[in-house]
Amino acid sequence: MSGASEPPASFAARLLRWQRQHGRHGLPWQGTRDPYRVWLSEIMLQQTQVATVQGYFARFIQRFPDVAALAAASSDEVMALWSGLGYYSRARNLHQCARQVMERFGGQFPRSAALLQTLPGIGPSTAAAIAAFCFDERAAILDGNVKRVLTRHLGDASDLAVAANARALHARALALLPANSADMPAYTQGLMDLGATVCTPRQPQCGRCPVAADCTARQQGRPESYPVKTRKLRRSAQTLWLLLAQTLPEAQSACWLEKRPAKGIWAGLHALPVFDSRQALLDALPASASVAWLPPLAHALTHKDLTLHTARVHLPATARLPIAGQWRRDWPDLGLPAPMRRLLQQQQA
């Protein structure tokens, strides 16, 4: 019919055109087909802002330029370099993954999303990103940003906390992929960029969106209603008591550190001794110890708000505390929880 408007180009075509003109192009892990760098960036970017990741990524690449160097490193080296980035299970899996790439695949990352998922710490979306960016595989990423873009565009109001609904969304994501596998790197980056810069959780900029013309959520006037996920972890609060025990003389001071259990808060990290009560901390000290209480610290974990009370004591280097651990002067080179590293740095200043 004369004068009828043409249907919009495919979702993929519009996204590709937008990404090439308006997407992000200057990030340090872009412009490479090296799966080591892509994998490292994808793991770091989980639950962490781009601005925070850039410095850590640069330091990791400088220290461990390839997967062989990372695999050969000690756990303490890896955890120390990761310290402050949070979600420390990522660092443990990162190290284990590097070693498995060396042992199982001869130092070469597998070239398919299916095989990539057999490695520690690589889930379906991370595997899809590596396979798409490095090997042009038509694999669909489905991280938080992408779920938001797709559920809004498709008007998918199903509860993504239900596994069957998440699988159905993945199938719809596969149907939207570009036909040409060579377009997969730009398409995948475009989805990430759109979710991060335009289709944001709050106040999305629909006027800048390349796929707004047929976006269901925009037509409904309620984009912030998507995605739907009813099962959410509730935040909790916890108070902990830390022991900052240092040897004399202060100028060459060592501190008493323990190794945290494999599970729980700060799992596997070196740490100041942690107690559940003030009295339990005091009971671990020699009767002659003079305690100075530092100002309490607030520290937020993923779904827990911590209040940290720190007791500072000075003891002879020959002292042995009735708790696990040892005197360490090399704490700057160890993987420590961020609030404890800050405490030690402040006491050394």
Locations of regions flagged by a protein language model:
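Intrinsically disordered, low-complexity, charged terminal extensions of DNA damage-control enzymes
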Residues: 1-25, 31, 193-349
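Catalytic cores of DNA base-excision repair glycosylases
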Residues: 7, 13-207, 211-220, 224, ...
